[in-house]
């Protein structure tokens, strides 16, 4: 396969705080990854000087994370690694303060979640206990449409590579992920040591009893021994190029000599120079002069591309972060007057009733929305209603809620445009709930601003 032919996939790594996520992820990036040798040598030297030699893989990640938190790394290449079949991007290194928020508003949908479980006595139990983070992260991944899962059972060296312990953990974890919604038969369970490297890229000699993992896939079975092979057995995603354009703006820049340049990630559809786009909810329509990525002109941008595009006769004051660009001729985006969403309350100290008005983070928008009406309480796993018009909901509950944004915002139904149909509910500096939008009541399309160039471009086509 030529270098360019590989499919790009996104994975999210979840698990308890001490499961060894950083070490395992660091190891993959380190061995197959986008970090150049010079950087690694620099990290190793620093780690040794600080007496942190034993943490070298985690250290790689800590350094990257520190840079990311300080806003230095625009260069996400560091978070990439390559398998024989895929280019893999680690969407979020957990342990990050805003992991839950990032996963929802996150720059992209994960194609697969890798759940890392620590095999050590007591460690495993802590990780999947009732209030464990692991449960919350796994539930979140499932709710947000990440339907593929790999389970890596880490720190097997601390159990002296005990087959009995491995089987016990598979049994417990299978029950656990089944409750969340995953089918264990479709999941690869891989015993690893993220630190020593066993079964990461090459089969380990420390577990002669281990015959390999197997899982059901469309049209048969997939088998393998290592975590890398398990990642390669992820079913490739269908990228939504055939859907109408949706591009949530991350920023809008004013660049001397060029003009107004909105920047964001194409979630669905295609963006080309010469297209006439409409921004919602600000209701501005204009022509796209040029599209670029990494300082190179593009003839077209596709889903997943982070692009900047130059628009004619629109000032920086008219469009802003949180607006969504779409094709004015093909299902253009509109503001939402209200929307119904399935909301899962994760951790709210009290009860949530009608009138509650927290901030919603949906794609790049950050806007207060009122819980106008609790329509029904539902069973989280089946989605069936268990109570009509409940008075309030509390932690652990799921409900269908009618929501009204406090100011114009553009959202979509999850089934139509997934990245614009999931949100985090933020209150008290944490994520108190997550939601998936079922249907949207669009605001009436008023007569917005249409620039001259848009009218002209619209006329000639």
From Swiss-Prot:
N6,N6-dimethyllysine PTM positions read 3, 317
Residue ranges for the region (G3) are 92-95
Entries under Pfam families matching the protein: GTP-eEF1A_C, GTP_EFTU, GTP_EFTU_D2
Query: According to the UniProt entry, which residues carry N6,N6,N6-trimethyllysine?
Result: 80
Q: What is its main location?
A: cytoplasm
Q: Region G5: list its residue ranges.
A: 193-195
List every stretch annotated G2: 71-75
GO cellular component terms, A-Z? cytoplasm
Q: Does the keyword Iron-sulfur apply?
A: no
Entries under Gene3D superfamilies matching the protein: P-loop containing nucleotide triphosphate hydrolases (3.40.50.300), Translation factors (2.40.30.10)
Provide the tr-type G domain boundaries.
Answer: 6-241
The segments labelled G1 in the record are 15-22
**Record-linked PANTHER family:** TRANSLATION FACTOR
Identification of the protein by name: Elongation factor 1-alpha
Q: Which organism is it from?
A: Pseudoechria curvicolla (Podospora curvicolla)
